Amino acid sequence: MHQSLTQQRSSDMSLPDSMGAFNRRKRNSIYVTVTLLIVSMLILTVGLAATTRTQNVTVGGYYPGVILGFGSFLGIIGSNLIENKRQMLVASIVFISFGVIAAFCCAIVDGVFAARHIDLKPLYANRCHYVPKTSQREAEEVITSSSKITPSTRALRNLTQAVKEVNCPQLSRGLCTPRIRGNTCFCCDLYNCGNRVEITGGYYEYIDVSSCQDIIHLYHLLWSATILNIVGLFLGIITAAVLGGFKDMNPTLPALNCSVENAHPTVSYYARPQVASYNTYYHSPPHLPPYSAYDFQHSGVFPSSPPSGLSDEQEPQSPSPSPSYMWSSSAPPRYSPPYYPPFEKPPPYSP
């Protein structure tokens, strides 16, 4: 009995605990997916800014931002569903897993490129030159003087590009005159007279920039994208783990055991007293005395004889019954109606 009551109490207490655990898991899953969505938007923004900063450097890792953003969006929707929650969360976990792999790869690529292929020492020393875009007439003069013939078809296609010659003094090879286009930041310290095998410092020109300060911005954007991809990597792993634990939880109500009665019933002192209905008195069996009036009236017909072996002297003198305890002879006998259970036919009348 005590064990049954303990089980009932535990089942009663499991209802708020289960609902509280479900709401807590739901709140945590929404928090991590919203945080991952914000980080993925930052990865996408910074990656696109780094990719479109120059024309010849396109290594900004914005692909993980797209994949992680879509996966976190599915996770937010699935966390607020009841019927199709599992399917949406499984799809979210799959996209987040691919986004984690992409973030790992892009973090390595962006970090290695920013560390080994961009040298900011010539930029900080003001040894890089920015070549603005020239007019069409100046470009024709440069091409004509360099080729010493009339402009060809190939030269005419390049008229829209600003072409200039920059003198880069080199101690080992003499004077180099590379030709560069307009809107380009060119660093002579990183250029070895066209010998790409002996390049000492990575990229020496950055095309389609507004100034050489854009290279510094590109360097910072690449490192920012690398850090954000690392953050997205770990946050994606945590989000996938949280969603994986929440996808199988449902707000189901536990079964309550109502077969065991309460051992200590509560008594309400302000409750209205119950009044028995007419049917209760009608169907209840009448309370009859153990003897009827007929027994009292005819008790003198058969007088009790004294037991054998006792003389008149040894017979105990019983006190005479008081008239108050005896039925009077003039009183009518009490009538007790026979009791018949409900739905039972009474016996036939007999005179």
Curated annotation (Swiss-Prot):
Transmembrane intervals: 30-50, 57-77, 89-109, 226-246
Main location: membrane
Gene Ontology cellular component annotations, sorted alphabetically: membrane
Signal peptide: none
Membrane topology: Multi-pass membrane protein
Subcellular location(s) per record: Membrane
InterPro entries registered for this protein in UniProt: TMEM255
Example GO biological process: response to bacterium
Keywords: Membrane, Transmembrane, Transmembrane helix
Entry annotated with the keyword Transmembrane helix: yes
Residue ranges, annotated region (Disordered): 302-331
Family stated for the protein in its record: Belongs to the TMEM255 family.
Protein name: Transmembrane protein 255A
